Amino acid sequence: MSELTTVARPYAKAAFDFALEQGALDKWAEMLSFAAAVAQDETIASFLSSSSTVGKTTEVFLGVCGDELDDNAKNFVKVLAENERLPVLPAVSELYQTLRAEHDKEVTVDVKSAVKLLKAQQTALIKALEKRLQRKIKLNCSVDKSIIGGLVIEAGDTVIDGTLRGKLDRLAYALQS
């Protein structure tokens, strides 16, 4: 995946910069997401890998996308096709979303708990995390039955282990040292 990321990064950055300049961040996010879904389709993916002519590849790909892409996005796809980079569109879309979240000062936080969190708990958690991380928070909550109690919060490289098991482990470590 790192090679795909390396190849996709300049394209994602170019698309993001253009969308920012045009004031069309949402529109480009939708178009890239759609084009990425098309590129991931098994039939299209096999066609992209077997097609030898750039013109035919571009024509078919844009034909499948139809009116979902505006002229600028179509030109973007043509550049990708000319450089034989259409298969990296999903990575371009993902990196674009990352750049957009960074620009919007937004972070997706994964929260694992033993039971489903109530709306009030989610709201309180969002407020506390926004204060601590100084960013807009988007929660992605999941239930993990192996957690006896408490929460595991993952935000990028930051992990906050507030589970009972984590607290017991820290207590045991403190007693041993």
From Swiss-Prot:
Gene Ontology cellular component terms for the protein in this record: plasma membrane; proton-transporting ATP synthase complex
PANTHER family to which the protein is assigned, alphabetical: ATP SYNTHASE DELTA CHAIN
InterPro entries per UniProt: ATP_synth_OSCP/delta_N_sf (IPR026015), ATPase_OSCP/d_CS (IPR020781), ATPase_OSCP/dsu (IPR000711)
The entry's keywords: ATP synthesis, Cell inner membrane, Cell membrane, CF(1), Hydrogen ion transport, Ion transport, Membrane, Transport
Keyword Protease among record annotations: no
Gene from which this protein is expressed: atpH
Protein name: ATP synthase subunit delta
Membrane topology label: Peripheral membrane protein
Family membership noted in the UniProt record: Belongs to the ATPase delta chain family.
Gene3D superfamilies the record matches: N-terminal domain of the delta subunit of the F1F0-ATP synthase
Function in brief: F(1)F(0) ATP synthase produces ATP from ADP in the presence of a proton or sodium gradient. F-type ATPases consist of two structural domains, F(1) containing the extramembraneous catalytic core and F(0) containing the membrane proton channel, linked together by a central stalk and a peripheral stalk. During catalysis, ATP synthesis in the catalytic domain of F(1) is coupled via a rotary mechanism of the central stalk subunits to proton translocation. This protein is part of the stalk that links CF(0) to CF(1). It either transmits conformational changes from CF(0) to CF(1) or is implicated in proton conduction.
NCBIfam families: ATP_synt_delta, PRK05758.2-2, PRK05758.2-5
